[in-house]
């Protein structure tokens, strides 16, 4: 009898959610509402972001990447400001905690969370231009603290080189978002200079340069250094093979990791891109051919040795696949930004991208965690959803992506949305 009651509750909830998904609500409105479930109150009354349901806690990197889409672009500016200021006050020696604990003993084990903080401040400024005074008072000191510690070699496992780029970690560490460990060793060793760390660091320095100009603090200007860094970046990371040109995934003294991964997108997509514009088309062409799927981007090209087509098996096997081909929807935000940057025919590019990702919105929202976006999908078709059934940065970056595409080509977007809701093309 108890089973029937539970079955009935389940059936009613499925109907309710399907009804919501079929309502007249816009996709942006729907994702904005879905995003609210990731904003949770901490015991001390502050707001935090849960990375995913049902088993993830609150992580610095995920919080910062998800924050704009969950708050600034979802009509929750106060909540977003609240979380961002809270994170800023948790900075210790230039580091944002990557794992938060209730007792205040946070773990500071990532090389990039602090650099994503700078990006989140940029997103706040873009969405809420009237917050410049708040940024000057509360965020600018944090950004300076981060740059001072990273650039001064005062962050564990992070060493600046003579050209101003950062080398992070050693063969036993995993300090980037591709942080899976199987049998005690990193599955995707990325020590050295991972391409997105170089892009994020350059973006942070360039943003600080523009704030220093705006706030009249010339000692924080870096214009000459930034020009030099762009040419060093190009020399280090640019790879040419028989299929065209793209960016290496990691540069280290003594060679580059030339496997095709999506991290190169951040050199094009961040507010201050480290790669020059005339190089965008070839990078995007390689990423589109090898990594783009209807549900997100593969973490590794299928032709690479070590590519895992399916996320399956025991914990070790799944960890082996986690960043070795598995598809992540959150990367669509960076991909969409890069596409818009490179586009000469904006409506055409928006139409093509929307057509590609239609299944994510037309089918997946009624699947897995109904109404939400999963953490990951298999690298090979049919790209079954896996991992958390509702992932903060998946929902957030999909919302930010739709916002950007709608802003760039409103007519194309409106037509696509109407069709996606009907289940057409």
Question: What is each model feature region?
Answer:
Residues 1-425:
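Acidic, mature catalytic/reactive cores of soluble proteins
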């Amino acid at each position: 009898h108890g089973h029937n009651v539970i079955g009935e509750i389940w059936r009613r909830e499925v109907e309710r959610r399907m009804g919501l998904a079929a309502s007249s609500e816009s996709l942006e409105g729907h994702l904005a509402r879905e995003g609210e479930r990731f904003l949770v109150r901490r015991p001390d009354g502050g707001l935090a972001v849960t990375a995913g349901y049902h088993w993830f806690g609150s992580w610095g990197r995920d919080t910062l990447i998800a924050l704009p889409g969950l708050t600034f672009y979802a009509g929750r500016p106060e909540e977003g400001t609240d979380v961002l200021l809270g994170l800023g006050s948790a900075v210790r020696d230039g580091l944002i905690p990557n794992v938060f604990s209730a007792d205040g003993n946070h773990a500071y084990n990532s090389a990039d969370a602090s650099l994503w903080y700078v990006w989140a401040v940029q997103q706040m400024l873009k969405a809420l231009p009237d917050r410049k005074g708040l940024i000057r008072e509360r965020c600018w000191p944090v950004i300076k603290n981060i740059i001072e510690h990273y650039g001064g070699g005062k962050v564990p496992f992070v060493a600046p080189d003579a050209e101003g780029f950062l080398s992070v970690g050693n063969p036993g560490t995993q300090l980037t978002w591709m942080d899976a460990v199987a049998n005690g060793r990193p599955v995707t060793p990325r020590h050295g200079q991972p391409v997105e760390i170089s892009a994020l660091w350059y973006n942070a320095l360039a943003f600080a340069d523009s704030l220093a100009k705006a706030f009249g603090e010339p000692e924080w200007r870096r214009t000459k250094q930034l020009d030099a860094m762009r040419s060093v970046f190009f020399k280090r990371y640019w790879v040419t093979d028989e299929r065209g040109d793209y960016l290496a995934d990691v540069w280290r003294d003594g060679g580059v990791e030339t496997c095709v991964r999506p991290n190169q997108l951040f050199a094009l997509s961040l507010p201050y891109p480290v790669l020059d514009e005339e190089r965008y088309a070839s990078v995007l062409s390689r990423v589109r051919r090898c990594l783009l799927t209807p549900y997100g981007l593969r973490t590794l090209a299928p032709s690479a040795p070590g590519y895992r087509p399916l996320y399956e098996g025991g914990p070790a096997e799944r960890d082996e696949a986690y960043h070795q081909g598995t598809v992540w929807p959150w990367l669509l935000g960076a991909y969409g930004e890069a596409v818009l940057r490179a586009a000469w025919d904006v409506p055409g590019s928006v139409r093509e991208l929307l057509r590609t990702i239609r299944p994510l919105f037309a089918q997946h929202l009624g699947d897995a965690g109904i109404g939400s976006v999963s953490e990951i999908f298999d690298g090979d078709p049919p790209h079954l959803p896996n991992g958390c059934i509702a992932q903060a940065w998946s929902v957030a970056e999909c919302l930010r992506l739709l916002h950007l595409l709608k802003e760039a080509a409103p007519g194309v977007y409106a037509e696509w949305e109407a069709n996606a809701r009907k289940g057409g093309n």
